[in-house]
Curated annotation (Swiss-Prot):
Belongs to the small Tim family. GO terms for molecular function: zinc ion binding. The modification Phosphoserine is found at residues 57, 87, 94, 96. This is Mitochondrial import inner membrane translocase subunit Tim8 A. It comes from the Eukaryota. It is a peripheral membrane protein. Disulfide bonds join 43-66, 47-62. The keyword Mitochondrion applies.
Length: 97
């Protein structure tokens, strides 16, 4: 009975890293979408005084600056996540069995 428990435990161990990786990726996507929403709201509140038919030069410059900072920040975050992903081998447990 113990051998069947240990073999099913090792089978689950082989699936867990894949599932964990999938969950991490989906969580990162969700966080990124939340960040886009927050930055859109922040830039709108910061830069848009009165909605009108045309942006004035101050509002336009503000939006450009806000979006550029968002892109810089997003690129930094993506690079950091990529470094984190590379430093964690996904299938290391299944290869050692």
């Amino acid at each position: 009975m113990e051998s069947s428990t240990s073999s099913s435990g090792s089978a689950l161990g082989a699936v867990d890293p894949q599932l964990q990786h999938f969950i991490e990726v989906e969580t990162q996507k969700q966080r990124f979408q939340q960040l886009v929403h927050q930055m859109t709201e922040l830039c709108w509140e910061k830069c848009m005084d009165k909605p009108g038919p045309k942006l004035d030069s101050r509002a336009e410059a503000c939006f450009v600056n806000c979006v550029e900072r968002f892109i810089d920040t997003s690129q930094f975050i993506l690079n950091r996540l990529e470094q984190t992903q590379k430093s964690k081998p996904v299938f290391s447990e299944s290869l050692s069995d």
